[in-house]
Amino acid sequence: MAVKKRGLGRGLDALLSGPSVSALEEQAVKIDQKELQHLPVELVQRGKYQPRRDMDPEALEELAHSIRNHGVMQPIVVRPIGDNRYEIIAGERRWRATQQAGLDTIPAMVREVPDEAAIAMALIENIQREDLNPLEEAMALQRLQQEFELTQQQVADAVGKSRVTVANLLRLITLPDAIKTMLAHGDLEMGHARALLGLDENRQEEGARHVVARGLTVRQTEALVRQWLSDKPDPVEPSKPDPDIARLEQRLAERLGSAVQIRHGNKGKGQLVIRYNSLDELQGVLAHIR
């Protein structure tokens, strides 16, 4: 169903004057068991205004394991949408994990929430969560701005962020799809992407690949962009090697009989590169691994 847009934020405060998603979730914890409904999981569907598309499979499996052992500790919040079906307002991870755990029903608090309020609540509450990646946050901000025809300042006020932060996040949407994928996977941080926005569109993707391959920091990325824009030959200063990583590279090289490089990122992610000069050398490496 299409939602009628509201001019420049008129009525947004009224939409949000009711309980927030967080308040509803707190209410669901304290609610009397007689008021809870145990809904068949197949009659519940994800919220269409939920900005998050991907969830960490490992974290989801951990939650599913907990639910198998202890059940769903916090009921989800849903709204009826007809045909004896329900749409999630809060608790999609719990619903997915419940399915993964093999349970047939899930405890839920059912609340009548109109479309426009559901949009505002879902978008604002999800933006204010800390576990969205920058691209998910940017897409949610754009959706909020477009649905209610808000200015950037009104969006900033609604979600409790500065206008500059909102503007920088919205600019991420203009990046090439390849860079958006790197952002979504955590290969690039928002600071990297913001720096790359200073390049022409045809060089942004090249710059992103350069940053990821060399493991550049945000500051080094900013220096790289300045260098490319000014066409100066001075190279970006490489980061000093971590002595612990260098020792580990040496130990692995000695064990495998081949050169090894560890590219360690800022968030614990990275790459292990094993170099070989011939198929025979590769066979030797594989023999050590087996």
From Swiss-Prot:
Lineage: Bacteria, Pseudomonadati, Pseudomonadota, Gammaproteobacteria, Pseudomonadales
Organism for this UniProt entry: Pseudomonas putida (strain ATCC 47054 / DSM 6125 / CFBP 8728 / NCIMB 11950 / KT2440)
CDD domains assigned to the protein according to its UniProt record, in alphabetical order: SPO0J_N
Gene label: parB
Gene Ontology terms describing biological process: chromosome segregation; positive regulation of sporulation resulting in formation of a cellular spore
Gene Ontology cellular-component annotations: chromosome
Family, per entry: Belongs to the ParB family.
Glycoprotein in keyword set: no
One Pfam family this sequence matches: ParBc
Annotated coiled-coil segments of the chain: none
The entry's keywords: Chromosome partition, DNA-binding
Taxonomy, superkingdom: Bacteria
GO MF: DNA binding
UniProt name for this protein: Probable chromosome-partitioning protein ParB
Job description of the protein: Involved in chromosome partition. Localize to both poles of the predivisional cell following completion of DNA replication. Binds to the DNA origin of replication.
